[in-house]
Amino acid sequence: MKEQFLKDVKGQPYLPRWFSSIFKMIQSPNAGSLIIQLPDNRKFIVESKKAGANGYIVVKNENFFSRLVREGQNGFSESYMDGWWDTPDLQAVLDFFLLAGDGIYDDLIGTNVVRLYAVSYTHLTLPTKA
């Protein structure tokens, strides 16, 4: 039996926060494919007509996508180290994103907004000399 992969988030209930937005952002990779397996075992795929790396991400923590929005590339790598996602082939996942197109994380507007908030908050709450 051939495994079923979802290519769209329409009609899919109870998706992790920010998954839909991130999935839409990576819909047109330059090459290769990426399968994202959610904690509830649903599998979504994005693929290009061009050959390339075929990545597979197993999401273990549904807050992974929120972390991507907040922290961008750092959130992606640190969440891997924290065990929030796994893969049978890390090199293929990295190659997919390398070939996916320039600035894939640049579209994460929330990353810049959250960074601005964090810096502002830090400066506003610094202890002052009395």
Predicted segments, located by residue:
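Acidic, aliphatic-rich amphipathic alpha-helical segments
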Residues: 1-33
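A generic structural signal for short, non-catalytic loop/turn and secondary-structure boundary residues
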Residues: 27-29, 48-52
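Conserved small/polar residues in nucleotide/adenosyl-binding loops
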Residues: 122-128
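Short amphipathic beta-strand/extended segments with alternating polar/hydrophobic composition
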Residues: 44-50, 58
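Accessory substrate-recognition/RNA-binding modules or partner subunits associated with SAM-dependent
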Residues: 53-117
